[in-house]
Amino acid sequence: MLNLINMEVLLFDCRSDQLVMMEEILARIGCKVSSVMKKYECFAKLMSGKYDLVIFDHGIPGLDVTGFLTEIETIDRCMSIAMMVTLPSRFYEDKYGCSGIDFLLLKPFGYNEVLLLVREAFQYSLKLRKAS
């Protein structure tokens, strides 16, 4: 069994209600959670510490997803990235291709979906760190 306790997760979303819900779920799982509502806050957090997983919402107004992902990759290539989405995964696969999104989290979601995401992201992050 994977030890998910103390897994470092950074949440980026402009909706405080969604942010609070995700924080609560991740805390129940045992993750250490940092959350931000602004892009500059997200990058400040990323520059100041290591994270195993970044979760962000596709629907953040004005967010250039491809540019955002490119910037994250320059900071840490071994970090898993998950995007919260509302449409079927095929839409995002066609739109973003190999842009660095490792996981899609389809809304609405609950504890079990987030737990599965965190488990898979943790395993993936470990593989990336071992390979680098």
Where do the PLM segments sit?
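Acidic, metal-coordinating helix/loop segments flanking the phosphotransfer/catalytic sites
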Residues: S35-L53
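Active-site residues of response regulator receiver
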Residues: D57-G59
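Short amphipathic alpha-helix used as the core "switch/output" element in two-component signaling
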Residues: T66-C78
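Alpha4 helix (beta4-alpha4-beta5 surface) of REC/receiver domains from two-component response regulators
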Residues: G67, L87-F103
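A short, hydrophobic beta-strand element within the central beta-sheet of small alpha/beta folds
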Residues: C78-R90
